């Protein structure tokens, strides 16, 4: 074990693994690569900004301090950190990669794994919360804070453990034949483990939302039609974006596990597949703010404050620009559902699932 960790600071180890798994090493910065890197950095900056706006909205408005919005804030935080990690990953790629020590390489890839997996686990936590809120016709009892902290803490703890396993020893240093082609210092079995866990999470989210659909459809027959339509619309968007963004990355990692070294040239283009998965962090805040009118209004408020002489509703107002903003009305179905004996109503424009 000591000899394994002694290799972590070896400056030649990363190049050794890349020479073994890659047919050619891209050590020169071409124009196309520079353009692609610039585009990814701009995309990640957009991820950071929009998720930061969601976090500001949740933090500044006490109405959003309920369980559902706190989970959305946790999702926004993980997506924001994913954007930051992917910027660092991009800037430390290319010719810079071969100058990294193994511990630096593990930190680069591990940070991306931790934040992206935290985003996935946050989606699972939201699905669990929605199932508890709807299936049991009860948002939370006296254990509200405990349950929220448990779900949020568990999502980050599992993400840290999952992303930190390679630097703790589950890697292929000293065993080149066991190395991944896409991630040359990661063991293929670790890659398979990650894909399996994410696939199980996807199935769990699907199962929870199917359960929610069944509960909503089987109760309150007089309101089942509008509830079902709105719920199905939200679930279709959430699961559709999740699958579209993550399926390419899952597929390339499964192919990586199955292919012997140098036998699948498509693996050398894996960075494009991971770039697609990053879009999930870009689209998550768009989806959830679009489906919640109050959250959308609060997220856009800082942007409206920068427009001279324009109030919350976009009308020309007197006085100092950006001041004396109108208070938000409580129109969220989630908030109304807390005081009703029935499950929350999923109405267009107000729904959060």
Curated annotation (Swiss-Prot):
CDD domains per UniProt: 7tmA_S1PR2_Edg5
Entry superkingdom: Eukaryota
Reported effect, residue 256 to E: Loss of protein expression
Gene Ontology molecular function, alphabetical: G protein-coupled peptide receptor activity; G protein-coupled receptor activity; G protein-coupled receptor binding; integrin binding; lipid binding; sphingosine-1-phosphate receptor activity
Effect of residue 248 to S: Loss of protein expression
GO annotation terms (biological process): actin cytoskeleton organization; adenylate cyclase-activating G protein-coupled receptor signaling pathway; excitatory postsynaptic potential; filopodium assembly; G protein-coupled receptor signaling pathway; negative regulation of excitatory postsynaptic potential; positive regulation of cell population proliferation; positive regulation of establishment of endothelial barrier
Effect caused by changing residue 245 to R: Markedly decreases protein expression
Annotated effect of mutating residue 156 to G: Loss of protein expression
Transmembrane segments: 35-59, 67-95, 110-128, 148-173, 190-210, 234-255, 272-292
Cytoplasmic topology ranges: 60-66, 129-147, 211-233, 293-353
Predominant subcellular localization, coarse grouping: membrane
Matching PANTHER family: G-PROTEIN COUPLED RECEPTOR (PTHR22750)
Function description: Receptor for the lysosphingolipid sphingosine 1-phosphate (S1P). S1P is a bioactive lysophospholipid that elicits diverse physiological effects on most types of cells and tissues. When expressed in rat HTC4 hepatoma cells, is capable of mediating S1P-induced cell proliferation and suppression of apoptosis. Receptor for the chemokine-like protein FAM19A5. Mediates the inhibitory effect of FAM19A5 on vascular smooth muscle cell proliferation and migration.
Name of protein: Sphingosine 1-phosphate receptor 2
Species for this entry: Homo sapiens (Human)
This protein's encoding gene: S1PR2
């Amino acid at each position: 074990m000591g000899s394994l960790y002694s290799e972590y600071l070896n400056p030649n180890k990363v190049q050794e693994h890349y020479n073994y798994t890659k047919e050619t090493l891209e050590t020169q910065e071409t124009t196309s690569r520079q353009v692609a890197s610039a585009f990814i950095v701009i995309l990640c900056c957009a991820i950071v900004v929009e998720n930061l706006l969601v976090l500001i909205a949740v933090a500044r408005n006490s109405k959003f301090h309920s369980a559902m919005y706190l989970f959305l804030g946790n999702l926004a935080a993980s997506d924001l950190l994913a954007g930051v990690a992917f910027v660092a990953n991009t800037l430390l790629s290319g010719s810079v990669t071969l100058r990294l020590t193994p511990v630096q390489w593990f930190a680069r890839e591990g940070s991306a794994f931790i934040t992206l997996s935290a985003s996935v686990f946050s989606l699972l936590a939201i699905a669990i919360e929605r199932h508890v809120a709807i299936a049991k016709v009860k948002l939370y009892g006296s254990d509200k804070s405990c349950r929220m902290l448990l779900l949020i803490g568990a999502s980050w703890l599992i993400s840290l453990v999952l992303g930190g396993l390679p630097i703790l020893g589950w890697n292929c240093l000293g065993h080149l034949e066991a190395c991944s082609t896409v991630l040359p210092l990661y063991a293929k079995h670790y890659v398979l483990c990650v894909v399996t866990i994410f696939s199980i999470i996807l199935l769990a989210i699907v199962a929870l939302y199917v359960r929610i659909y069944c509960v909503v459809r089987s109760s309150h027959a007089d309101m089942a039609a509008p509830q079902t339509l709105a719920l199905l619309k939200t679930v279709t968007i959430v699961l559709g974006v999740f699958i579209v963004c993550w399926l390419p990355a899952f597929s390339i990692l499964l192919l990586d596990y199955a292919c012997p070294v140098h036998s699948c040239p498509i693996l050398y283009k894996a960075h494009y597949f991971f770039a697609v998965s990053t879009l999930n962090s870009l689209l998550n805040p768009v989806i959830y703010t679009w489906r919640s009118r109050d959250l959308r209004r609060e997220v856009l408020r800082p942007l409206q404050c920068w427009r001279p002489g324009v109030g919350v509703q976009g009308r020309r107002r007197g006085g100092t620009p950006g001041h004396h903003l109108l208070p938000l009305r409580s129109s969220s179905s989630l908030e109304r559902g807390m005081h009703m004996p029935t499950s929350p109503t999923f109405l267009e424009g107000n729904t959060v699932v």
